């Protein structure tokens, strides 16, 4: 793809799909700075391909573990498997489309693709951030308000909540599908007309400002603010619990407190990864939306934009590996899946892991949860 094609717009006309244009040229397009090297258009899709492959391996393995290992089917893990499903959907649909813009000078996926791809990606982003919010709420209830937990039909209720998250995410993405279209754009300075998949016409500078700000608030600021409030109360409760615990307290109680801390930290790591990976993409889109009439063809802007896009998609492949590092039981199951074709190693893994299964705080024999008495309250413990 000729980088000059995108130089006419100072923003990715779709915050999740960079501009893919079909030109009707009457004059030579304005050239970007001399820094651009043609090899970049092959390196970037290769990086996309690496992200897709790694993400597929991690998320498919994670979903397979939660579907086939009965002891892993609990409240937090059900949310995490829903999160993995959303990431998987993003990687197999939107990531290849995003990579294709560097290899083609035109939009390859027609009008239907122009409406469907933004819808899928916004749905996936919604599933990710709203599931993280639900996970934070679950940790808040388990740690701060354990008396509110009801053991009966816990998994069924969580399944309904996960389904509701998908429905809400799809409803919020409907405007993206309705208004996204192959819009003709005309550049007065060069007398060029091109077709681009965009969520709004090019005629009004207010459209990108509204679109970028709404996306930033609904899919980033508001959910992360809610999560921050939850974690403030979680941290405060854990600190108070540590102070109130007797010096020679019950060993089981101490283990339960440590389990709660690990679970809260796991969810917090997921939240931190999402915030870190998606913030640059939102910031760049806001910058472009509020500098709509200007054109930035600098190397810094180009590299920053590419890195922001790659970082956003990287978020869809890192969660399984973060869970691998944080959870002993998931690490064991992940190794079991990878070593399934090596019986001797698999048997050795089972024999060494069986003695520690009952001690790890990330695995439960109860499909929904376990309950214990801590500081006079019934405490709900989920596992990852």
Curated annotation (Swiss-Prot):
GO BP terms, alphabetized: G protein-coupled receptor signaling pathway; learning or memory; motor behavior; phospholipase C-activating G protein-coupled receptor signaling pathway; positive regulation of behavioral fear response; positive regulation of respiratory gaseous exchange; psychomotor behavior; regulation of cell population proliferation
InterPro entries to which the protein is assigned, alphabetical: Bombsn_rcpt-like, Gastrin_pep_rcpt, GPCR_Rhodpsn, GPCR_Rhodpsn_7TM
Gene Ontology MF, one: bombesin receptor activity
Segments on the Extracellular side according to the record's topology features: 1-39, 98-115, 176-209, 287-299
Keywords: Cell membrane, Disulfide bond, G-protein coupled receptor, Glycoprotein, Lipoprotein, Membrane, Palmitate, Phosphoprotein, Receptor, Transducer, Transmembrane, Transmembrane helix
Expression tissues: Expressed in the hippocampal CA1 region (at protein level).
Ranges facing Cytoplasmic side: 64-77, 138-153, 236-265, 327-384
Chain ranges passing through the membrane: 40-63, 78-97, 116-137, 154-175, 210-235, 266-286, 300-326
Cell location: Cell membrane
Pfam families documented for this protein: 7tm_1
Membrane topology qualifier: Multi-pass membrane protein
Disulfide bridge positions per record: 114-197
This protein's GO CC annotations: plasma membrane
Signal peptide start-end: none
Glycan-bearing residues: 5, 20, 24
Keyword Lipoprotein applies: yes
Residues bearing a lipid moiety (S-palmitoyl cysteine): 340
Keyword Disulfide bond: yes
Residues carrying Phosphoserine: 351
Function summary: Receptor for gastrin-releasing peptide (GRP). Signals via association with G proteins that activate a phosphatidylinositol-calcium second messenger system, resulting in Akt phosphorylation. Contributes to the regulation of food intake. Contributes to the perception of prurient stimuli and transmission of itch signals in the spinal cord that promote scratching behavior, but does not play a role in the perception of pain. Contributes primarily to nonhistaminergic itch sensation.
Family: Belongs to the G-protein coupled receptor 1 family.
Protein name: Gastrin-releasing peptide receptor
Species assigned in the record: Rattus norvegicus
Gene: Grpr
């Amino acid at each position: 793809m000729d980088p000059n094609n995108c130089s006419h717009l100072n923003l990715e006309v779709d915050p999740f799909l960079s501009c893919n244009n079909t030109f009707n040229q009457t004059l030579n397009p304005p050239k970007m700075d001399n820094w651009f090297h043609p090899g970049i258009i092959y390196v970037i899709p290769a990086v996309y391909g690496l992200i897709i492959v790694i993400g597929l391996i991690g998320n498919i393995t994670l979903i397979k573990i939660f579907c086939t290992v009965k002891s892993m089917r609990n409240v937090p893990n059900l949310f995490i498997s829903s999160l993995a499903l959303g990431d998987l959907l993003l990687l197999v649909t939107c990531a290849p489309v995003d990579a294709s813009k560097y290899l083609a000078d035109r939009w390859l996926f027609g009008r239907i693709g122009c409406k469907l791809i933004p819808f899928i990606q916004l749905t996936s982003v919604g599933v990710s951030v709203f599931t993280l919010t639900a996970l934070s709420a679950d940790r808040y209830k388990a740690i701060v308000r354990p008396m509110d937990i009801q053991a009966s039909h816990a998994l069924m209720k969580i399944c309904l909540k996960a389904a509701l998250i998908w429905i809400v995410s799809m409803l919020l993405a409907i405007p993206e599908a309705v208004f996204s279209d192959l819009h003709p754009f005309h550049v007065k300075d060069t007398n060029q007309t091109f077709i681009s998949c965009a969520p709004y016409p090019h005629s009004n500078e207010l459209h990108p400002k509204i679109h970028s700000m709404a996306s930033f608030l609904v899919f980033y600021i508001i959910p992360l603010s809610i999560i921050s409030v939850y974690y403030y109360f979680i941290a405060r409760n854990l600190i108070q619990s540590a102070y109130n615990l007797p010096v020679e307290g019950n060993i089981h109680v101490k283990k339960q407190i440590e389990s709660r801390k690990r679970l809260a930290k796991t969810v917090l790591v997921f939240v931190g990864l999402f915030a870190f990976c998606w913030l640059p993409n939102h910031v760049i889109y806001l910058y472009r939306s509020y500098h709509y009439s200007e054109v930035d063809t600098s190397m810094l802007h180009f590299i920053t934009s590419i890195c922001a896009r790659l970082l956003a998609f990287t978020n869809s492949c890192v969660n399984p590996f973060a869970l691998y590092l944080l959870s002993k039981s998931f690490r064991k199951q992940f190794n079991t899946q990878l070593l399934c074709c090596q019986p001797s190693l698999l048997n050795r893994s089972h024999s060494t892991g069986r003695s520690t299964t009952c001690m790890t705080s990330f695995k439960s024999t109860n499909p929904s949860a376990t309950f214990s008495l801590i500081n006079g309250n019934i405490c709900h413990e989920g596992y990852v």
